[in-house]
């Protein structure tokens, strides 16, 4: 079942228009864990020519979204606290790694780190999700052949 959940999430991320628009790529997903990368794009630069904080937040949020939903039930964000440590180099690919540090029946806590290609810390985040008691809707479609 775990493999089916991960594969279904991977398919959903590939279809997610927002992720495609930002160039977000899911690199790895496991229960409670995800790695997402983003290539630098001119469209994502701020007025100073650096990757916009909103784009970095979106990278964090994508990794968080994947990691907290890998258990097969719908999980939604309750709180996301981001600290920006430094601006990335203009041409550096960014990588967000989300790690589950606590999970209960109702909530999950995740630490997400964004690093550049030289493994320099760009941003860090602590995020809390609420776990609903419903299966991921796209899993039901897979199980029924839809």
For the regions a protein language model found, what residue spans apply to each?
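Terminal targeting signals and extreme-terminal segments of soluble enzymes
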Residues: 1-146
